[in-house]
From Swiss-Prot:
Assembly, per entry: Homotrimer. Interacts (via C-terminal region) with TMEM98; the interaction inhibits MYRF self-cleavage.
Name the record gives this protein: Myelin regulatory factor
Gene3D superfamilies linked to this entry: NDT80 DNA-binding domain
Primary enzyme class: hydrolase
Record organism: Mus musculus
Location of region: Disordered: 56-150, 171-200, 246-267, 279-339, 721-753, 891-922, 951-999
Mutagenesis or variant effect for S587C: Does not affect autocatalytic cleavage and generation of Myelin regulatory factor, N-terminal part
Length: 1138
């Protein structure tokens, strides 16, 4: 070709194009001009052929040019004869012809014949030339984008195009044969038998270039000359397209989200998280047939690319040469391999697809009315969708294009489609794309497509041709959503909680008798479609990490994954975590509810059932989790723990390894939960250890006692045999024989020693005998005296029916002298229910053997709940404080109240219901003041720490549920301090059960704040102690509670009331010298719903606080106040003694 100057080059360039209305900078292909201007030596630069008269075209110099053609030339099928340009005949195959610049787009030199035999034909994808008046649709700087759509110049066709008309648009042009060559050109030589013609594509249809075919050596046996000629033409065409595409600079701002590697192979770069490949990347065929991809070789036969207004790129993959005949093509069954490859790779972030409405898919049948297997159908999103971590969804900018590629594998040759009306003959297949709303799948979103002039038109379905036993690849680009999703604006830099989403549906439909039937469809993940102005949204880098309110802190909204891009918790770490500090857990009682004590025995049993093992993780799991596979571990098995402790095991879903293996329902263990089980088990072991230590101590004490007894027995035996055996024998012999016969016996002894020894022995024995007699006599007198005193005391204490027998040991303890400096001790009294009693030895302990039995007074009674005693000890060991029985008249402080004694409460006896003065108790009434009253009748020994409360001296003994008789008329009027009404469940329930019109004010709850000890109806002892208007609570105080301890009594009411302390009384002398009752100002009251009164543990054995609850502002402690609505509360404290 001759070298031309710049002016002629520009003239030739613009003469080859119809530039009317298409001279925008984005539409003019100036690559040839820039190449010519940039090169100094442009001798090798080739321009497209300029239209010239037909007479000037000479056949030896190359094929004639088509008027208005530029760039690529259409390739006629092999055997169809040479053609000039698109329709002209090709010259006969020649050998050794040099490559002409005008033929570098597909008309290369005729290759040499291949002599290796026949092989499978390899068809090249047809390429349409640039039509006059149009330019290449894609700008030269957007090589990564899809080709632009072809144009339909008829406006009426654009408005009336429907899926029904898709099957017939351009059919005549596609099926017409190439016109004969011009008459002035010489005719071509006789062609071989013509194969099926390629369809004549419309002028504006451009097909995307596919990867080059494998080398000739991989083609199998030799090819026949026509197939060889066409194969070599295809090789040259693909090489030129690849070289031309490589010169186009890629767009720097495009993000690659999907790989165009072979669909059924897993690229090593994908596993390593490297940059993903773009469409058109050259990928060599794998050496092993088992992993071979479906080669993208176009088959023979007509090509149906679609209507004139839809851009698409179709490629078909034939069965590889090594595939055995009769077996299904691996290219048609590639979905399983693709799922195990890039789709399940955790480092491969791409939008996912899933089948859509499978229950509506139709079935295909062949010409013999046999049902065909399900076709393979896969959709890939090539570009346009970027994953946003902050939004946890894929984002598509409305101004940007998105592109999808569909792979369709057809098994068999379909002729009919099954419909509800029966089998219908097929007209055509087409792809339909539309969007749906996530919250309403029945609402469709239209898809638009950009044209070459940047305008947008509604997207119409793409007609595709599906040859049998082949895979068809369809690429549709330059797509947009017609609208954006709702609620896209962020709130304070965070994703909108009301964000709406779209989903893209790509469906393959069949057209039969003016009806459409879905054969396969896939739907994408949720998509956010944003407006065209990206400034409305903050970048992901600003949204992910933001500055917190505190200095030098940042926060992230959402989940965080380290070494993983799919965190299912707030923080997921694949690898080891090093913590130099401590891990904190919430444990505040105020944030908890339903708190219950655990059974440590069960925890010990569960821990004993758990198996502890040594193990190592599998290499594939260690690689995906980021841990070392060789490091030995010690732990438990989740499946075994799930059977023992199900709440400690959690299912986290499926785990996919790098090699494609999957663990379904992967289980993880909450070791914190197992740790707490260990704490409970250790507590139970501590209890068992303490019990064993106590038993060992008891055994050691008994062992020491037995050893002492053995030593004493041995000393007695040796002393009696060594010291008194000789003297005793002489004394017995001297008393039995006459004195005058003794000298012969003494003659054998020494004369001076025998008389002295006999005299001393006799005097010693006589003195010892006299002393023993005196001691025995004194013991008998003492025992008799004590017995008489005990009988007299019992007569004073026991009632007329003799229902009580007092232990003699208790009286002995009272008469035993006490150390003035030590603490006074009282006899332990067991709780009783009055009836016929019996005296027995009690050996009850707290489960510890070897405790000395104590003499306790018990009765047979029904069991009841144990009362909680007031036990507060500030320092260990706790001193035992016990008061002695009173020996004088009741002592009161005249300044405590208006009277010396409090107003007694109504008695259970009707004739003592009114107020009156209490009578002092007799001195001999010792037992009544320390008597333990309980409904359960359980006696406690010396070592018991939860003693039953001791009853008040003013409480009449109630009738218990004993097995013996009971006196219903039994009363102690002379000893009654105040009557006791019948017990009730709670103070608040009296008001509800009486049903009175004007109920007396009462309290809803009472407790001691220092140890949160509630005072409930359990302390209403005996029966009838609590009733409407009068509540008497008997509160036991343990012997370890120190004297002068200040407590706070909190009383709550449902309505505002007034509470006043009326009196503080005691009938006994103080336990220590100088003890006195507290003075207080009378008629001090508190008002409201919550009242707190100070209470002091006085140095008295028993003392009583009297509070009165009245209406608001009517506090009065006088006896006349009984007429007004008021409730009296008596809190009787009594000290327990071991």
């Amino acid at each position: 070709m001759e070298v031309v100057d710049e002016t002629e080059a520009l003239q030739r360039f613009f003469e080859g194009h119809d530039i009317s209305g298409a001279l925008e900078p984005s539409n003019i292909d100036t690559s040839i001009l820039e190449e010519y201007i940039g090169k100094e030596d442009a001798s090798d630069l080739c321009f497209p052929e300029i239209s010239a008269p037909a007479s000037t075209a000479s056949f030896p110099h190359g094929p004639p040019a088509i008027p208005g053609s530029s760039g690529l030339h259409h390739l006629s099928p092999p055997g169809s004869g040479p053609s000039p340009g698109r329709h002209g005949p090709l010259p006969p195959p020649t050998y050794g012809t040099p490559l002409n610049c005008n033929n570098n787009n597909g008309m290369g030199t005729a290759p040499k014949p291949f002599l290796g035999g026949s092989g499978p034909p390899i068809k090249a994808e047809p390429k349409a030339p640039y039509a006059p008046g149009t330019l290449p649709d894609s700008p030269p700087d957007s090589g990564s984008e899809a080709y632009s759509p072809q144009q339909v110049n008829d406006p009426h066709l654009l408005r009336t195009i429907t899926p029904e008309t898709l099957c017939h648009v351009g059919v005549s042009s596609r099926l017409e044969h190439p016109p004969p060559p011009p008459a002035h050109l010489p005719g071509p030589p006789p062609p071989p038998p013509p194969p099926p013609h390629y369809p004549v594509l419309q002028r504006d249809l451009y097909m995307k270039a596919e990867p080059p075919v494998p080398p000739y050596a991989a083609m199998g046996p030799g090819l026949v000359p026509p197939e060889l000629h066409h194969t070599q033409q295809t090789q040259v065409l693909h090489q030129l397209l690849q070289q031309h595409g490589a010169e186009l600079p890629p767009h720097p701002s495009k993000k690659r989200k999907h790989s165009e590697s072979p669909p059924n192979t897993l690229n090593a770069q994908m596993l390593n998280g490297m940059i993903k490949q773009e469409p058109g990347t050259v990928t060599a065929l794998p050496p092993h047939p088992a992993r071979a991809p479906s080669p993208p070789w176009p088959p023979q036969g007509p090509l149906s690319p679609g209507t004139g207004s839809l851009p698409l790129s179709i490629a078909r993959a034939q069965t590889p040469p090594w595939h055995p005949p009769g077996a299904p093509s691996p290219g048609l069954l590639q979905d399983s391999d693709s799922l195990s490859g890039s789709y399940l790779d955790p480092n491969y972030q791409s939008i996912k697809w899933q089948p859509h409405q499978q229950n509506k898919w139709a079935t295909l049948y062949d010409a013999n009315y046999k049902e065909l297997p399900m076709l393979t159908y896969r959709v890939d999103a090539d570009k346009g969708f970027n994953f946003s971590v902050g939004d946890d969804a894929f984002v598509c900018q409305k101004k940007n294009h998105f592109q999808v590629t569909v792979y369709i594998g057809m098994l068999g040759e379909p002729k009919y489609v099954k419909t509800p009306e029966g089998l219908k003959p097929l007209d055509c297949f087409y792809l339909k794309l539309h969007g749906v709303k996530l919250e309403a799948l029945n609402q469709s979103i239209n898809i638009e497509q950009s044209q070459s002039d940047r305008s947008k038109r509604p997207f119409n379905p793409v007609t595709v041709n599906l040859p049998p036993e082949q895979v068809t690849k369809v690429t549709v680009g330059r797509l947009h959503f017609s609208e954006t999703t709702a609620n896209n604006m962020r709130k304070k830099g965070k994703p909108n909680p009301d964000q709406r989403y779209f989903m893209l549906v790509v469906a393959l439909q069949a057209h039969a008798q003016n009806q459409n039937y879905t054969l396969a469809a896939q739907i994408s993940e949720r998509i956010i479609v944003r407006a065209s102005n990206p400034g409305q949204f903050e970048s992901d880098s600003d949204v992910l990490w933001q500055r917190a309110q505190l200095p030098d802190t940042v926060f992230h909204h959402g989940r965080v994954g380290i070494n993983t891009d799919r965190p299912d918790e707030a923080l997921v770490v694949h690898g080891n975590v090093k913590v130099m500090g401590s891990l904190m857990h919430p444990s505040d009682l105020r944030a908890k509810e339903h708190v219950q004590e655990v059974d440590t025995t069960e925890q010990l049993k569960r821990i004993s059932r758990m198996r502890l093992v040594h193990y190592r993780y599998k290499p594939e799991f260690a690689a995906s989790a980021g841990i070392e596979a060789t490091a030995p571990e010690t732990g438990v098995i989740a499946q075994e723990v799930k059977e023992i402790l199900p709440e400690a095991v959690k299912d986290t879903g499926d785990v996919v390894f790098a090699n494609g293996k999957t663990i379904e329902n992967f289980l993880v263990v909450n070791k914190e939960r197992i740790f707490m089980e260990n704490v409970g088990a250790v507590k139970e072991l501590c209890k068992l250890t303490d019990n064993l230590e106590t038993r060992i101590d008891e055994l050691e004490r008994w062992s020491h006692k037995l050893a002492k007894l053995r030593r004493l027995d041995s000393l007695k035996s040796t002393g009696s045999s060594g010291a008194f055996s000789h003297a005793g024998s002489q004394f017995s012999r001297a008393g039995s024989v006459p004195h005058k016969k003794r000298p012969p016996k003494l003659a054998n002894k020494s004369s001076p020693a025998v008389p002295d020894q006999a005299c001393i022995s006799q005097r010693f024995l006589q003195g010892t005998i006299i002393a023993l007699v005196v001691v025995m006599a004194f013991s008998v007198v003492s025992m008799s005296t004590l017995y008489v005193l005990s009988l007299r005391s019992e007569e004073d204490l026991v009632d007329a029916d003799g229902s009580l027998a007092v232990s003699t040991s208790c009286l002995l303890a009272l008469l035993r002298p006490q150390d003035p400096g030590g603490s006074e001790a009282m006899c332990p009294w067991s709780s009783q229910s009055f009836g016929t009693t019996q005296l027995r030895q009690s050996s009850m302990t707290t489960g510890l053997p070897g405790t000395q039995p104590s003499l306790l007074l018990v009765t047979k009674s029904a069991s009841g709940p144990a009362l909680r005693a007031l036990d507060l000890c500030s320092s260990q060991p706790c001193p035992i404080v016990c008061c002695s029985p009173p020996v004088s008249s009741p002592a009161t402080d005249p300044a405590l109240g208006p009277t010396l004694t409090p107003t007694p409460s109504p008695s259970s006896n009707p004739k003592h219901s009114g107020p009156g003065q209490m009578a002092p108790l007799p001195v001999t009434n010792i037992r009544a003041k320390s008597w333990g009253i309980s409904a359960n009748g359980i006696s406690y020994s010396k070592h018991s720490k939860s003693l039953e409360p001791l009853a008040s001296p003013v409480v009449p003994f109630p009738g218990g549920q004993s097995k013996t008789k009971n006196s219903p008329s039994f009363n102690l009027q002379s000893r009654a301090r105040r009557g006791a009404p019948q017990p009730s469940p709670s103070p608040a329930q009296f008001t509800q059960t009486q049903g009175q019109l004007d109920p007396a004010p009462s309290l809803t709850s009472i407790q001691l704040l220092e140890n949160s000890m509630p005072i409930t109806s359990q302390y209403c002892v005996p029966e009838g102690a609590c009733r409407l208007g009068n509540f008497t609570y008997h509160i036991p105080v343990s012997s370890s509670t120190p004297l002068h301890l200040s407590l706070t009594l909190q009383m709550n009411s449902s309505t505002p009331v007034s509470v006043v302390l009326c009196s503080l009384t005691s009938e006994e002398e103080p336990c220590e010298e100088g003890g006195f009752l507290q003075r207080f100002h009378p008629h001090q009251d508190t008002q409201g719903t919550s009242h707190q009164w100070p209470v002091t543990i006085l140095s008295f054995r028993e003392f009583t606080y009297h509070f009165r609850v009245t209406l608001l502002g009517q506090a009065n402690c006088s006896s006349e106040a009984i007429v007004q609505p008021a409730t009296d509360y008596y809190f009787h404290f009594y000290r327990l003694c071991d």
